[in-house]
Design a protein with these regions (language model features):
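Core alpha/beta catalytic barrel or barrel-like domain that forms the active/cofactor pocket
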Residues: 82-90, 118-124, 185-192
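Alpha-helical scaffolding segments of alpha/beta enzyme cores, especially the outer helices
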Residues: 34, 68, 72, 108, ...
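Short glycine-rich loop/turn motifs that provide flexible caps or phosphate-binding loops at active sites
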Residues: 23, 41, 59, 90-93, ...
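A generic, well-ordered mixed alpha/beta core segment in the N-terminal half of proteins
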Residues: 91, 95-152
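Short beta-strand segments at enzyme active-site cores
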Residues: 48-49, 117-120, 228
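Glycine-rich anion-binding loops and their surrounding alpha/beta cores
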Residues: 2-20, 26-27, 75-78, 99, ...
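Acidic, glycine/proline-rich low-complexity segments that act as flexible tails and inter-domain linkers
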Residues: 2-98, 113, 269-271
Length: 274
């Protein structure tokens, strides 16, 4: 009597995956991780990888899928050590407002006030300057070993984690995303994948519809305390031009509320001033 081993067929699995996407089915947390593993295995040509991104975008990413994608990317990133109370101040970008890099300015102010900040960022996409553009202009060396950044966070209370150094998996998708020229699930993943594995964040998103879902994703990923914010003016920031929509994650619960500049004792500003 002979037995026949059941051998996994990645190409067949990939075809089944793409059929599921074409039919509008959701993948869930584990399904998304499996999908990205298949797509990164070398068997998927760029056109299939692009079709996957578009299929998920057209249907709309679920919180479970975003969570699964973040887990996959986190499992493949280079990590750095940081104190338990470290925070990140970061945004998705993509708000097309053309403002200066507010989160980097906020990082400097927060660190000066005593917060421990492990700032994660990259170059500009739609703003006048990305975090790395600003810091490079200030003379900060970006391409330093993780141990140096870890020491800066511990000793100075602030360090910058330049995304390309810590996320080799993102590089394979970069030309595909550039060719598409559209927002995809990857626009959400950078802010969710801080190499210092912080559990406290202020995270700006480019759409009001993402505020509470991303707070839910952070809860699933183990964040302890976070604000997810979006300005009524379209900014992925706490805005000074009007209302900011906030979802606060704290101790496992999520609270939604609105803030105005007046709540913080600030005058209203304009987009042009920013």
């Amino acid at each position: 009597m002979t037995t026949t081993a059941i051998v996994a067929n990645p190409a067949r699995e990939l075809k089944h995956l793409m059929n599921s996407i074409a039919e509008g089915q959701t993948l869930g947390d584990e399904g998304m991780q499996k999908a990205l593993d298949l797509l990164m295995s070398g068997i998927a040509p760029p056109v299939v990888m692009g079709a996957f991104l578009m299929g998920v975008r057209v249907r709309g990413e679920t919180t479970e899928e975003i969570t699964g994608a973040a887990k996959f990317m986190r499992s493949r990133m280079t990590t750095v050590d940081a104190p338990p109370g470290a925070i990140d101040i970061v945004g998705t970008g993509g708000d097309s407002r053309g403002t200066y890099n507010i989160s980097t300015a906020a990082t400097i102010v927060a660190a000066g006030a005593g917060a421990i900040v492990a700032k994660h960022g990259n170059r500009a996409v739609t703003s006048l300057s990305g975090a790395s553009d600003v810091l490079a202009a200030l003379g900060v060396k970006l391409d330093v070993p993780p141990v140096v950044v870890s020491r800066a966070i511990a000793d100075a209370g602030v360090g910058f984690l330049w995304a390309p150094l810590y996320h080799p998996t993102f590089k394979a998708w970069a030309p595909i995303r550039a060719d598409l020229g559209l927002r995809t699930i990857f626009n959400l993943l950078g802010p969710l994948c801080n190499p210092a594995q912080v559990t406290r964040q202020v995270l700006g998103v480019y759409s009001r519809n993402l505020v509470e879902p991303i707070a839910e994703v952070l809860r699933k990923l183990g964040s302890f305390h976070a604000w997810v914010v979006h300005g009524a003016d379209g900014m992925d920031e706490l805005t000074t031009t009007g209302v900011t929509y906030v979802a606060e994650l704290k101790d496992g619960d999520i609270y939604a509320f609105e803030l105005t500049p007046e709540d913080a004792g600030l005058p209203r500003s304009t987009i042009e001033a920013l």
